Swiss-Prot record:
<feature type="repeat" description="HEAT 2">
    <location>
        <begin position="926"/>
        <end position="962"/>
    </location>
</feature>
<keyword id="KW-0677">Repeat</keyword>
<dbReference type="GO" id="GO:0034455">
    <property type="term" value="C:t-UTP complex"/>
</dbReference>
<dbReference type="InterPro" id="IPR022125">
    <property type="entry name" value="U3snoRNP10_N"/>
</dbReference>
<keyword id="KW-0687">Ribonucleoprotein</keyword>
<dbReference type="Pfam" id="PF23243">
    <property type="entry name" value="HEAT_HEATR1"/>
</dbReference>
<feature type="region of interest" description="Disordered">
    <location>
        <begin position="884"/>
        <end position="905"/>
    </location>
</feature>
<dbReference type="InterPro" id="IPR016024">
    <property type="entry name" value="ARM-type_fold"/>
</dbReference>
<feature type="repeat" description="HEAT 3">
    <location>
        <begin position="1049"/>
        <end position="1086"/>
    </location>
</feature>
<dbReference type="InterPro" id="IPR056473">
    <property type="entry name" value="HEAT_Utp10/HEAT1"/>
</dbReference>
<comment type="similarity">
    <text>Belongs to the HEATR1/UTP10 family.</text>
</comment>
<keyword id="KW-0698">rRNA processing</keyword>
<dbReference type="Pfam" id="PF12397">
    <property type="entry name" value="U3snoRNP10"/>
</dbReference>
<dbReference type="GO" id="GO:0045943">
    <property type="term" value="P:positive regulation of transcription by RNA polymerase I"/>
</dbReference>
<comment type="subunit">
    <text>Component of the ribosomal small subunit (SSU) processome.</text>
</comment>
<dbReference type="Pfam" id="PF08146">
    <property type="entry name" value="BP28CT"/>
</dbReference>
<dbReference type="InterPro" id="IPR012954">
    <property type="entry name" value="BP28_C_dom"/>
</dbReference>
C-alpha cells in the first residue's frame, strides 16, 4: 500500500495537469510581460491579440516567421491544451516551438519578440514543456532584465544541465558570465547543451553574431579551464584525460569546423582548436585530424583565419610533412606562399611551411606533380623557413631529383623544372642562398652527377633526333634503351668530319651544340668519355698543331654546363698538356681560360683548374734555350683579333708569381683569383716582399695580354670574368684600360638588339652585367672614351638598346667625381643639352633625355656649372618674355603681329627652368651661396614669365625660394658674404607674396623674408608691413604644419628687428604695433584650432611679452568678447610665460582698464574698440569685457604653481615678484574703488579678481608682499590691504604651520595699528584681522594674543566712542576668551566693566543698540563658557540686572537669543552658590521687569537646577526656599496684571520647583514643604485675608502640580495640607473670585491626593473622617454661584475609591443621600451626578448600599425638576448595567 502511495505521489509531482484551481491560476499567471495579478485575470483571446501584434511585427522583419502562421499562431492555437495532447502531438509541437525559439534568438532585445514568446509561455507553457530550449535561447542574453523575468517563471524542476541557475532563480538575479563559464567547465552537460543549441541554430541558418560570440567565448574559456583541470603529472593519466577531453570536445569542434554556412562559427571553433593545440599537448594524430577537418570545411571567407590556425597547430606538431588532404587544400589557396609570408609577420609559420614543402616534394617524386615546384621555391625564398628547415627541404629536393625515374617523368620535363629550381636556389642571393650552398657542400651524395643527370635528361634526346621527321613518330614506338642510345650517339659522332680550326675563331654552333649534348651524355662514364675524346671530329692527334681539340674543351669549361662536364673538360686539356709532344709549345693561350675556370662558382671546377695551372707551371720553370712556338698564335681568334703574347719571363711571372701562389685560396673562394690578379697588376710592390713583385714591364705586358684576349675571345662569359679584374686597373705605363679595351665597347655597341640578345641567351649571362662591364672600360678624363660614350648615346642604333644606354650614363655618373673641373663643365653642358633634347617622333619618353636628367640629378655639380646653367636659363626666360624686334614683327604681308614666342618655345623654357632649378635645389644651395644674386634675378624674371604663361609658376618659384632659403645660413655665418640692400630683393619677395596664390610659394617666401630679416634686416624691413597684412588673410588660415612653421619662422625673425626699429623711433611702442597686432587678432577665427595657441605664443615672445602680452590679451577679449572659449584661450596664453611676465602683464592690463575710464583715453583708444568716452554705457561695456578677463588670468595653473614656490626662495627674483604682487594688489584695490560707483557688475568682477589674487600667494608671502603697502600714508589703501588680508585669513587652512607662523608674527603689527591709529575704520579692520587670526591660530602663541587682547580691551579700542569699533572689539574679545581662556584673566578687570557698561548703554539709549548689545553678551557668554569663575559677585548681579532690563526693553529676536544664550551659559557653568545667591537677590528686579524677565529668570533657574549636581542643590536649600517663597508670593505682589501671564509664570514656577524637588531627598525637602504650608497660612497678618488667599492660591497651584507629578511617593505629605484644606473648605462662601479659585484648587489638590494613594493613607479614619464630612457637606453649596460641582464630584469619587471600605462607602453614601432630600434642585442634581460617577467607578462595590438608595431613587422618579428626574433615570440605567438586572421590581 505504501509503495502504491509513493508511486502515486511521484506521478502527481511530475504531472503538469491538475484540478486544483489555485495551482491552475498560479500557472496561468506566469508571464514575461505582465505582473502575476494582471496575468491571472487575462483570457487567452486577450493574450493572443496582444502577442499577435508582436508576431506580425516579427514577420515584417523576417519572412521566415510566416511559416509558423498555421501552427503556433493559428486562431485554433487559442484552444490548444498541451495536457490534453498525445505524446506524438506534443513531440510535433516541440519541433515547432524549438524552431521558433531558434529564430527568435537574434531579436530577443526587441519587444515584439518578447510578446511572441509570451504567447508560447502562456498558451503552450514552453517554460514547462520546453524548458531547456527556452533557457538556451535566453542564455546569451543573461545580463538583460528579461532573463531575470524568465528565471522567475521557470518551474521548480529545471533540466539537469541548467540546475546551476537555482540560486539565481531564488534570488532573482542575473548570473554573471564567470558563473556560466565555471559551470560549463565543471559540467560537461551544460557545455554540450550550449554547443548543441548553437550547432542547431547554425544548421538551420538561424544563428546570429551574439550567439556565436557567446558560444565562442564560453567554449574558449571552458576549454582553457578543462585543460587546467585535466592536467596531470603522470603520463598515463594525462593520456586518459586527453582522450576524455577529445571525446567531449572533438565531435562539437568537428561539426563546427565544417559548418560552411556559418563562417563565424568556424572562426570561433578555430579559436578553440588553437587553445587546444597551444595548451593541450595533444598527440600528432589528434592535431593532424583537426587540421584535416579544418581544411575540409573552410571557405574563401574563412581561409585566412584557417591558415593562421593551421600555423599555430603546426607549431605544436612534429616537424613532418602535412597530410594529403591539407596539402591539396593549401595548393588550392591562391598565392599560398605569399599569403604565408604575410601571415608570418604576425605568427610563426615555419612549421606549416616546412610541412607543406616536404609534402609537395613527396608528391613531386611520387606522382610527378610539377605544379608544386613553384610553391616550394617560393617558400624557400620567402623568409618563412628557418635555417634547418631550409636545409631539410633542399635536401629533400635533391633526394627527389635522384629518385625521379622515367616512369614518373617520361619526357624529362619534371627533371628539367626541378633542375632549374635547384640551380636557381643555389645561385640565390642573401641568407637563403648561403644556406642552400652550405647544404650542397654538406650532402654526402654526388651533386655533380645529379646535376649532369638533370642536364642530360633532355639533351640526349635532342642528340638522337636525326631529322625533324623523328618528332612525328608514333608515340607507341618502343623506347630505345640507354645503351643502344649511347651506341647510336657514338655512331653518329664517328660520322662527323674532323675539325681543325679554333672553336674561338669560327663558331660552328650546330656542331658545337651537338658535341656538347654528346659530351654531356657520356661525361659521367669514363670509358664512354674516352671514346668521345678519341672521336675523329675532335682531331686529338693533331692537337699540337690544330686548335680545335683544346679550344673545344676550353670553350666547354667556360660555358654554362654542369660541373662534372667542366671538370672532365679541364682534365682532358690537363692530360693533353702532360704529353711530351707538347713540351716544346708555349701554352700561354690557355692561361686566360684557366683564370676563368679558377673563378668558377663550383669548387670542383676550381680544383680541376688549379691542377691544370700546376701542369702549365711546369712548362715555365726553366727558360728554354730556344723560343717556343706559342700555341694558338695563329688562328686562335678571328683574323682581325690581334693578341699581345707574353714572352717567357712574363708568362712565368704570371703563372708562378700570381696564379700558382693563389691556387689554394682560389679553390676555397671563387673571387680570390681575380682579386689576386688585380693586386698583382695594380702595383709593383707585393705584401710579401720585394722578391715576388712584378716588374713594371711585366705588369704592362700581362695587362695588354689579358686585354687582347678579352677583345679577341668570342665568349661573353670569358670577357665578363676577365673584365672583373681588368676594370679595376686604371692604367699601366701611361696606357689606360680605355686605350686597350675601347674597341670592345665599340664592338658591343655596334651589335643590334637582336644580335646582342642572341649572344647573351647562348651563354646565359646577364645583360646588365655585360653592359656595365663593357662600359666600365672607359675611365675618367679619357677624351676618346668620353667622346665615344656621347657618340654612342647620340647613335640612333644604340638608342634602341636601353640597357646599354643606361650603362653609358651610369658610367658617366660613376666617373664624374674623378673628372677634372674642365671635363665636368663640358660634360655637364653636354648632359644638359641631352636632357632638354626633344624627339617629337618618339611616342615613348625619351630614354636619352631621361638618363641625362637622371645623371645630372645624381652627380655633384659645382658652383660654376650651376651658375652657367642659371645664366643659360636666364637667357631663355628673357627670350620667352621679350617681344620680337620691330623688324621681325613687320616681316610678311599680314597685319597680325606676333606678341610672344611660340608655345613650344615657352614650354621648352619652362621645362629647362624647372630642371635647372631642381638641380640647384638638389645641389645643396648652402654650398653655393654665390648663386644668390642669380637666383633673385631668376625669381624676378619668373614674375614676368607668369604674365606671359598665364600660370602661377608656383613650383618654379618654390624651387628658387627654397634654394635661396638654404643659402641664408651661409651668409649669416660668413662675414665675407654680403647681400646688397640696394638690389631690391625685399621688394621682389613682397611682390612674390602678394601676387601669389600658392600656399607653398607664400610659405617659402615668408621663410626667406624671416631668414633675411635675421641675416640682413636692411634688405626686407621696409617691405614688412604689407607682408604681415597679407599673412593675416592667407597663410594664417592654412591648417598644415608647414604653414605653421612658416608663420612661426616669419614671426621669430621679422618681428624682433621690426620692434627694435619702433623703439628707435621713440614712439609709443604698443600703439605703433596696433595695426600689426590687429592683423593677427582678426585672423584668429580663421586660424586652425590646433595652431592658435602656439602661433600667438610665438608672436608674443618675439614682440616682447613684457610689453605686448597684455595688449594681445586685451584685444582678443575686446574683439571676440569674454566668452568661455576666449577666456580659456587667453588663460592658456598667459600661462605659457613666467610669473614675472604674468604679473607685469596683469599690472599693465589694470592700467589699460583704468585708461578706459579717463576723460581722454590714449592706450585703450589705440588698442580697443572705438567708443564714445562720454557714453558711460559704452565705457562700462568695454571695461566689463576686460574685467571679466582679469580674474580668469589670475587663476592659470602655471601662475599658481610657480608663485607658490616663492617661500622657498629669498633671492632678488622673489623680491621682485613680491613687489610686482604688491603693485598688482594696489592696482586691483584702486580699480575697485574707481569702478564701485559705476556699476555693480564691474565691482563684482574686481572682487572676484581680488579673491583670486589673494589666493595666489601663501599667507607668509602675501604679508611680505604687502608690508610696503602698509607703510604708505594713504590710510584708505592701508585699510583695503588689511581687508584683503582679512579675506585671505578666512581661506587659510588651520593646519598649515607656515600660515600660522606668519600670521601670529603679524599680530604685533596689527596691535600697533589698533593702539596708534586715529582712524576708526582702520582700527576696526585691524581688530577684525586680529579676531580671525586669533580664532585660527591664537592658541599657538598666547602671549601675542594676550597682548592684542589687552590693547583691544583698553581705551584705544573698546574705550573709543565708535560704536562699530566697540562692537568689533567685544566680538574679538569674545573670540580671544575662547583662545586664551585663563591667559586672558589679567585683561578682564578692564574688559568686563567696559563690556557691562556697553551693555547698559546699549539698553538705555533712546534707540537700543542691538549690535553693541549682542556683542557685549557674546563676550560675557564667552567668559561664562570658558572662565565662569570670573563672573561673580557684582559682575553677575550687574549682568542679571542688565538682562532684566534687556528683557523689559522689548528688543528684537536676535537680541533675545544672544541674551538667553549668555544666561544659559551662566546657568550651566557658574558655581551654584554664587549663581543661586545672585538669583535670590535678583528676584525682585526680575519681577519688577515684567513677564519676559521673569520667564528668562525661571529658565535660568531651571537650567541651573538641571545642570548642577544634587549636592549643590542640597547645600543651598535655604536659598531655594527664599527664591520659591518669593515666587509663590508673586500673585499677591501684583506685579503682573495679566492673569494669563500670571498663570504661565506660576506653571513655570511649579515646573521649576519640581526640578529642585527631584534633586532633594525627603529629609531635605520635608522641612521646606512644612515651612511652605506654614508660610502660606500664617505668614501674613490675620487682617490681610485677601493677601493670604492669593498666597494660598499660588501654594495650592503648586500642591496640585506636586501631587499630580510625584503621585504616590508624596501621598504622606497630604497630612500637611489636611487642616488647611478643611479650613478653606469650611469657610463660608463669598463672591470673591480669589476664594473661588482657591476652593477649586483645594478640591483639585485633594483629588490628586486621593487618586494616587496606594498606601491606604485615606483609609485611616483620622484622615478620612477629617476630610469626608467636609467634602460631602460642600454639596449643600451646589446651588451657589461659586459652586465647584465638577471638582467636588471628582474629589468625592476619588476619596471613595481611595477609602476602599464598606464603612467609609456607607458613611459617604449616607451623607450624600441626605442631600437628596434638599429643597434645592441643584443640590439634588449634584448628588445624583456624584452617585452616577460613584456607580460607574466603583460598580457593585458601591451598590452594596443599594437598599438604602432605592427609596431615594424611587422618590426622585417623580421629582419636580425635569433635569433631576432625567439624571435620576440615567442613574437607574447605570445601576442596571452594573448589576445586570432591572430595578423596576425593586422600585415597585
Amino acid at each position: 500500500m505504501s509503495s502504491l502511495a509513493s508511486q502515486l505521489a511521484q506521478i502527481a509531482a511530475n504531472s503538469r495537469s491538475t484540478l486544483n484551481t489555485k495551482v491552475l491560476k498560479a500557472a496561468h499567471s506566469k508571464s514575461l510581460i505582465f505582473e502575476p495579478r494582471v496575468a491571472a485575470t487575462q483570457t487567452y483571446p486577450e493574450i493572443y491579440s496582444i502577442c499577435l501584434e508582436g508576431f506580425e511585427e516579427l514577420c515584417n522583419l523576417d519572412s521566415r516567421f510566416t511559416k509558423f502562421t498555421q501552427s503556433l499562431w493559428s486562431p485554433q492555437s487559442q484552444e490548444a491544451d498541451r495536457t490534453q495532447m498525445s505524446a506524438a502531438e506534443n513531440a510535433a509541437l516541440d519541433k515547432h516551438v524549438e524552431a521558433f525559439l531558434h529564430l527568435c534568438g537574434s531579436r530577443l532585445r526587441l519587444m515584439p519578440t518578447i510578446k511572441a514568446i509570451e504567447w508560447l509561455i502562456r498558451r503552450f507553457r514552453v517554460h514547462e514543456f520546453n524548458t531547456a530550449a527556452l533557457i538556451a535561447t535566453f542564455l546569451p542574453y543573461h545580463t538583460i532584465p528579461a532573463f531575470v523575468t524568465l528565471l522567475s517563471i521557470l518551474p521548480a524542476n529545471i533540466p539537469k544541465e541548467y540546475r546551476f541557475l537555482d540560486p539565481y532563480i531564488r534570488s532573482l538575479t542575473a548570473p554573471p558570465r564567470a558563473a556560466i563559464v565555471q559551470q560549463a567547465t565543471n559540467r560537461p552537460e551544460l557545455l554540450t547543451a550550449i554547443s548543441q543549441y548553437t550547432l542547431d541554430s547554425c544548421k538551420y541558418q538561424m544563428e546570429y553574431p551574439g550567439l556565436i560570440s557567446f558560444w565562442g567565448g564560453v567554449m574558449v574559456e571552458a576549454t582553457n579551464g578543462l585543460l587546467d583541470k585535466y592536467r596531470s603529472g603522470r603520463r598515463s593519466i594525462q593520456i586518459e584525460n586527453d582522450n576524455a577531453l577529445m571525446q567531449q570536445l572533438g565531435p562539437v569542434l568537428s561539426d563546427a569546423m565544417v559548418m560552411k554556412s556559418s563562417p563565424g562559427l568556424q572562426i570561433a571553433s578555430y579559436m578553440v582548436v588553437t587553445i587546444l593545440a597551444a595548451k593541450g599537448g595533444l598527440a600528432d594524430n589528434a592535431l593532424t585530424a583537426f587540421m584535416d577537418q579544418l581544411v575540409h570545411g573552410w571557405t574563401p571567407e574563412t581561409m585566412r583565419p584557417g591558415l593562421v590556425t593551421l600555423c599555430i597547430i603546426s607549431q605544436h606538431r612534429s616537424a613532418k610533412q602535412l597530410s594529403a588532404r591539407v596539402t591539396k587544400a593549401l595548393l588550392k589557396v591562391p598565392e599560398v606562399a605569399s599569403v604565408m609570408n604575410e601571415i608570418g609577420k604576425d605568427h610563426r609559420v615555419d612549421k606549416l611551411a616546412n610541412g607543406l614543402a616536404l609534402a609537395l616534394v613527396d608528391r613531386l617524386h611520387k606522382k610527378g606533380d610539377v605544379r608544386s615546384l613553384p610553391v616550394v621555391n617560393s617558400l624557400l625564398l620567402g623568409n618563412v623557413l628557418r635555417e634547418k628547415q631550409i636545409k631539410v627541404v633542399y635536401k629533400s629536393l635533391l633526394v627527389a631529383a635522384h629518385r625521379i625515374n622515367d616512369q614518373v617523368d617520361q619526357d624529362g620535363a619534371i627533371r628539367k623544372e626541378l633542375g632549374t629550381v635547384l640551380v636557381s636556389l643555389s645561385q640565390a642571393g642573401g641568407e637563403v642562398g648561403d644556406i642552400v650552398r652550405a647544404t650542397i657542400d654538406e650532402v654526402d651524395f654526388d651533386i655533380d652527377a645529379l646535376e649532369l643527370t638533370l642536364g642530360a635528361s633532355i639533351r640526349p634526346k635532342l642528340a638522337v633526333e636525326d631529322a625533324p621527321e623523328a618528332a612525328a613518330e608514333d608515340n607507341n614506338t618502343p623506347k630505345v634503351d640507354k645503351e643502344a642510345q649511347v651506341a647510336q650517339n657514338f655512331e653518329k659522332l664517328s660520322k662527323l668530319k674532323p675539325q681543325t680550326a679554333s672553336c674561338f675563331a669560327e663558331e660552328p654552333l650546330d656542331l658545337l651544340e651537338e658535341l656538347y649534348s654528346l659530351f654531356l651524355s657520356v661525361a659521367a662514364n669514363e670509358s664512354n668519355l674516352q671514346k668521345f675524346d678519341e672521336a675523329p671530329v675532335l682531331s686529338r692527334p693533331q692537337a699540337p698543331t690544330k686548335l680545335f681539340y683544346a679550344s673545344f674543351y676550353m670553350r666547354l669549361w667556360c660555358g654554362s654546363l654542369p660541373t662534372l662536364a667542366k671538370v672532365a673538360a679541364l682534365d682532358r686539356v690537363k692530360n693533353l698538356l702532360k704529353d711530351e709532344e707538347f713540351a716544346t709549345l708555349d701554352f700561354q693561350a690557355v692561361v686566360p681560360y684557366a683564370i676563368v675556370a679558377l673563378s668558377d662558382p663550383a669548387k670542383k671546377v676550381r680544383r680541376a683548374a688549379a691542377e691544370l695551372v700546376t701542369v702549365l707551371g711546369s712548362f715555365y720553370e726553366t727558360k728554354p734555350s730556344k723560343a717556343r712556338r706559342v700555341w694558338g698564335s695563329e688562328g686562335l681568334y678571328a683574323k682581325n683579333a690581334a693578341v699581345n703574347w707574353l714572352d717567357f719571363d712574363a708568362t712565368k711571372s704570371l703563372i708562378h708569381s700570381v696564379l700558382i701562389p693563389s691556387l689554394e685560396e682560389s679553390i676555397l673562394h671563387e673571387d680570390h683569383i681575380l682579386a689576386a690578379l688585380t693586386n698583382a697588376l695594380e702595383s709593383s710592390k707585393s705584401k710579401d716582399g720585394d722578391k715576388k713583385h712584378l716588374s713594371h714591364s711585366t705588369r704592362f705586358a700581362i695587362f695588354k695580354f689579358l686585354s687582347s684576349h678579352v677583345v679577341g675571345t668570342p665568349l661573353i662569359a670569358v670577357k665578363l670574368r676577365l673584365l672583373q679584374s681588368l676594370n679595376q686597373i686604371k692604367s699601366i705605363s701611361g696606357t689606360s684600360r680605355t686605350d686597350l679595351l675601347l674597341s670592345l665597347l665599340q664592338w658591343w655597341a655596334r651589335l643590334s638588339e637582336a644580335e646582342a640578345q642572341q649572344l647573351l641567351a647562348r651563354e646565359a649571362v646577364d645583360e646588365a652585367s655585360v653592359n656595365n662591364a663593357f662600359v666600365d672600360v672607359v675611365i675618367a678624363n679619357n677624351e676618346a672614351g668620353l667622346r665615344l660614350i656621347f657618340e654612342l648615346i647620340r647613335d640612333s642604333n644604340v638608342i634602341t638598346r636601353n640597357g646599354l644606354v643606361q650603362s653609358l650614363f651610369s658610367r658617366v655618373q660613376k666617373i664624374w667625381s674623378s673628372m677634372k673641373a674642365e671635363t665636368q663643365f663640358s660634360t655637364a653642358r653636354a648632359l644638359l643639352t641631352l636632357s632638354q633634347a626633344v624627339h617629337p617622333t618618339s611616342s615613348e619618353p625619351d630614354v636619352i633625355a631621361t638618363e641625362a636628367t637622371d645623371v645630372l640629378h645624381k652627380v655633384e655639380l659645382t658652383t660654376d656649372i650651376l651658375l652657367d646653367f642659371l645664366e643659360s636659363l636666364y637667357d631663355d626666360i628673357k627670350k620667352a618674355t621679350e617681344k620680337p624686334a620691330t623688324k621681325r614683327r613687320r616681316v610678311g604681308s599680314s597685319e597680325k603681329s606676333v606678341d610672344s614666342q611660340s608655345p613650344a618655345d615657352v614650354s621648352a623654357s619652362l621645362s629647362k627652368a624647372t630642371f635647372v632649378l631642381e638641380l640647384v635645389q638638389e645641389s645643396e644651395p648652402a654650398k653655393h651661396p654665390e648663386l644668390l644674386p642669380s637666383l633673385f634675378t631668376t625669381l624676378s624674371e619668373l614674375q614676368h614669365l607668369r604674365t606671359v604663361v598665364g600660370s602661377e609658376l608656383g613650383y618654379l618659384q618654390s624651387l628658387v625660394l627654397s634654394s635661396l632659403l638654404a643659402m641664408m645660413p651661409a651668409y649669416k655665418d660668413s662675414k665675407e658674404l654680403t647681400i646688397d640692400p640696394a638690389a631690391g630683393h625685399g621688394d621682389i619677395l613682397a611682390s612674390c607674396i602678394q601676387r601669389s596664390s600658392s600656399p607653398t610659394v607664400i610659405n617659402a617666401a615668408l621663410l626667406l623674408v624671416a631668414s633675411l630679416a635675421r641675416t640682413a634686416p636692411d634688405v626686407v624691413l621696409h617691405s614688412v608691413m604689407p607682408i604681415f597684412t597679407f599673412m593675416g588673410s592667407s597663410v594664417l588660415k592654412q591648417a598644415d604644419d608647414y604653414s605653421a612653421h612658416v608663420v612661426n619662422q616669419t614671426v621669430k625673425e621679422v618681428i624682433p628687428p621690426l620692434i627694435e626699429t619702433f623703439r628707435k623711433s621713440r614712439r609709443n611702442l604698443v600703439a605703433s604695433t596696433a595695426e600689426l597686432l590687429t592683423s593677427f587678432v582678426v585672423a584668429y577665427e580663421h586660424i586652425p584650432s590646433h595652431r592658435k595657441q602656439d602661433l600667438f605664443i610665438t608672436l608674443i615672445e618675439n614682440l616682447g611679452p613684457e610689453d605686448f602680452l597684455f595688449a594681445v590679451l586685451a584685444m582678443f577679449v575686446d574683439k571676440y568678447g569674454a566668452t568661455d572659449n576666449m577666456l580659456a584661450f587667453t588663460t592658456q596664453i598667459i600661462g605659457s610665460f613666467s610669473v614675472e611676465i604674468q604679473l607685469q602683464t596683469l599690472i599693465k592690463h589694470l592700467d589699460l582698464i583704468s585708461d578706459i575710464f579717463k576723460p581722454k583715453p590714449v592706450l585703450s583708444a589705440a588698442l580697443l574698440a572705438k567708443v564714445d568716452s562720454n557714453s558711460e554705457q559704452d565705457v562700462v561695456k568695454l571695461a566689463t569685457k576686460q574685467l571679466t578677463l582679469l580674474p580668469k588670468l589670475l587663476v592659470n595653473r602655471r601662475l599658481r604653481h610657480e608663485i607658490s614656490g616663492l617661500a622657498e626662495k629669498d633671492d632678488m627674483e622673489s623680491v621682485k615678484i613680491r613687489e610686482l604682487y604688491a603693485q598688482l594688489l594696489e592696482g586691483v584695490l584702486t580699480l575697485a574703488g574707481t569702478v564701485k560707483p559705476k556699476k555693480d557688475t564691474l565691482y563684482t568682477r574686481c572682487a572676484e579678481a581680488l579673491s583670486n589674487l589673494l589666493n595666489l600667494l601663501s599667507i607668509a608671502e602675501f604679508i611680505k608682499s604687502v608690508e610696503a603697502l602698509l607703510d604708505r600714508p594713504n590710510v584708505i589703501l592701508r585699510q583695503k590691504v588689511l581687508r584683503a588680508l582679512e579675506r585671505r585669513v578666512d581661506s587659510e587652512s588651520i593646519n598649515n604651520p607656515k600660515s600660522r607662523e606668519a600670521l601670529l608674527a603679524f599680530l604685533p603689527q596689527l596691535t600697533a595699528v589698533i593702539r596708534e591709529s586715529d582712524d576708526m575704520n582702520y582700527k576696526h579692520t585691524a581688530v577684525n584681522c586680529v579676531d580671525k587670526i586669533a580664532e585660527k591660530y591664537g592658541k599657538k602663541d598666547l602671549d601675542a594674543v594676550a597682548a592684542a587682547a589687552a590693547t583691544i580691551a583698553g581705551d584705544s579700542c573698546l574705550g573709543q566712542p565708535s560704536q562699530e569699533l566697540r562692537v568689533m572689539a567685544l566680538l574679538c574679545l569674545a573670540s580671544l576668551v575662547d583662545v586664551l581662556q585663563d591667559a586672558i584673566v589679567p585683561v578682564l578687570p578692564i574688559a568686563i566693566p567696559k563690556a557691562l557698561g556697553c551693555l547698559e548703554e546699549s539698553i538705555k539709549a533712546e534707540k537700543p543698540d542691538g549690535a553693541l548689545h549682542n556683542a557685549a553678551y557674546a563676550f560675557m557668554a564667552a567668559l561664562a563658557q570658558h572662565i565662569p569663575y570670573m563672573i561673580s559677585g557684582a559682575y553677575l548681579d550687574r549682568l542679571l540686572v542688565c538682562s532684566n532690563a534687556s528683557a523689559a526693553a522689548g528688543l528684537n529676536e536676535e537680541c533675545r537669543d544672544s541674551r538667553t544664550d549668555c544666561l544659559q551659559f551662566v546657568a550651566k557653568l557658574i558655581e551654584g552658590k554664587v549663581l543661586f545667591t545672585a538669583l535670590e537677590k535678583n528676584w525682585a528686579n526680575a519681577a519688577s521687569s515684567g513677564y519676559l524677565a521673569l520667564e528668562e529668570y525661571l529658565h535660568v533657574l531651571g537650567t541651573a537646577l538641571d545642570k548642577h549636581p544634587k549636592s549643590s542643590i542640597a547645600k543651598n536649600t535655604t536659598l531655594f526656599t527664599g527664591i520659591f517663597l518669593n515666587a509663590f508670593d508673586l500673585r499677591r505682589s501684583g506685579v503682573l496684571s495679566s492673569t494669563q501671564e500670571l498663570e504661565k509664570i506660576e506653571l513655570l514656577i511649579n515646573e521649576t520647583s519640581l526640578k529642585m524637588i527631584y534633586k532633594l531627598n525627603d529629609a531635605a525637602f520635608r522641612p521646606m514643604f512644612s515651612h511652605l504650608m506654614e508660610w502660606s497660612t500664617t505668614g501674613l497678618p490675620k487682617s490681610d485675608l485677601a493677601g493670604k488667599a492669593q498666597r494660598q492660591v499660588s501654594t495650592y497651584g503648586f500642591l496640585q502640580h506636586f501631587f499630580e507629578n510625584l503621585k504616590s511617593i508624596v501621598t504622606s505629605y497630604a497630612s500637611y495640607i489636611i487642616d488647611s484644606a478643611v479650613k478653606i473648605l469650611s469657610a463660608p462662601l463669598t463672591s470673591d473670585d480669589v476664594l473661588k479659585t482657591l476652593r477649586s484648587r483645594v478640591l483639585r489638590t485633594l483629588t490628586k491626593c486621593f487618586e494616587h494613594d496606594q498606601d491606604g493613607f485615606w483609609q485611616a479614619p483620622a484622615h478620612f473622617n477629617a476630610v469626608a464630612p467636609v467634602l460631602v457637606a460642600q454639596f449643600g453649596h451646589a446651588a451657589g454661584a461659586d459652586n465647584c460641582t465638577n471638582d467636588l464630584v471628582l474629589a468625592v469619587v476619588e476619596l471613595a475609591a481611595a477609602a476602599d471600605s464598606k464603612e467609609h462607602h456607607k458613611e459617604i453614601n449616607s451623607a450624600l443621600l441626605k442631600h437628596l432630600r434638599s429643597e434645592q434642585a441643584a443640590v439634588r442634581l449634584a448628588v445624583i451626578k456624584c452617585e452616577q460617577e460613584l456607580t460607574a467607578r466603583l460598580g457593585e462595590e458601591w451598590l452594596q448600599s443599594l437598599p438604602e438608595m432605592l427609596p431615594f431613587i424611587s422618590e426622585l422618579q417623580d421629582d419636580d425638576d425635569e433635569v433631576v428626574e432625567r439624571e435620576n433615570r440615567r442613574w437607574i440605567v447605570g445601576i442596571e448595567e452594573t448589576l445586570g438586572e432591572s430595578l423596576d421590581n425593586m422600585l415597585q
